[in-house]
């Protein structure tokens, strides 16, 4: 057990170094909050009330943060062989790749949620918004843990521009990301429905929305890490 923990810790540290030094990772981290905020503008232009439109960026950011590691293995580049030789496989490998994303996503979302509620001057959506964010983030991480094993695709090399993408001879670059992205949305539909009920019917549905989102996220995350870890051993 201690050996597995040490391997997981080593994997986590190496991934954190990549996230801090590799501009491909840094660009991803910058794009997520920006994309979340930009979703408000077209909604406001379309006439969506501010108190509704302002709730959209948090779930969007949670979903994209969870989706980021769906191709994490490909970003390893030549360092992958050092990783393979070290014997880090299975669940420690999966968790080690996801922890750096969680360490970034959780503080960002923890700041974004209260700022959103302060902006609209309404704290009633606190539990529903937190529950939906947890569902989307953890579910996307779970699906990404599987997709990164079964459907990796070519990415730009270390040092290349993040906007420079290589040719991809297969459809992995299409169905892999889509599976992780849409999968998280599908399993979060019950939580989304409860959030809508909370907004329409009142705060009596708020606790149910929070716990449903948290339970969904944890369950999909655990299953995804377990399945991804097992597949990485094959």
Model-inferred region functions:
Residues 16, 20, 91-102:
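Interfacial transmembrane-helix starts/ends
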Residues 1-9, 13:
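Single conserved hydrophobic/aromatic residue that forms the stacking wall/gate
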Residues 22, 29-32, 76, 83, ...:
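Generic beta-strand/beta-sheet core signal
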């Amino acid at each position: 057990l201690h050996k597995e923990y040490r391997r997981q810790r080593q994997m986590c540290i190496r991934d954190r170094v990549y996230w801090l030094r590799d501009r491909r990772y840094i660009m991803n981290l910058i794009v997520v909050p920006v994309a979340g905020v930009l979703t408000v503008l077209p909604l406001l232009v379309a006439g969506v009330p501010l108190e509704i439109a302002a709730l959209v960026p948090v779930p969007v950011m949670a979903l994209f943060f969870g989706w980021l590691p769906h191709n994490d293995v490909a970003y390893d580049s030549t360092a992958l062989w050092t990783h393979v030789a070290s014997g880090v496989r299975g669940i420690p490998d999966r968790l080690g790749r996801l922890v750096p994303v969680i360490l970034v996503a959780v503080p960002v979302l923890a700041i974004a949620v209260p700022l959103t509620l302060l902006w609209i001057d309404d704290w009633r959506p606190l539990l529903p918004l937190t529950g939906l964010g947890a569902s989307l983030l953890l579910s996307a991480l779970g699906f990404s843990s599987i997709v990164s094993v079964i459907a990796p695709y070519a990415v730009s090399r270390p040092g290349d521009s993040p906007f420079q993408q290589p040719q991809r001879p297969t459809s992995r670059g299409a169905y892999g990301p889509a599976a992780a992205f849409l999968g998280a949305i599908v399993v979060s539909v019950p939580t989304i429905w409860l959030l809508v009920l909370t907004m329409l019917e009142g705060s009596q549905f708020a606790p149910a929305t929070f716990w449903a989102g948290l339970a969904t996220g944890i369950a999909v995350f655990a299953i995804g890490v377990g399945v991804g870890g097992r597949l990485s051993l094959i």
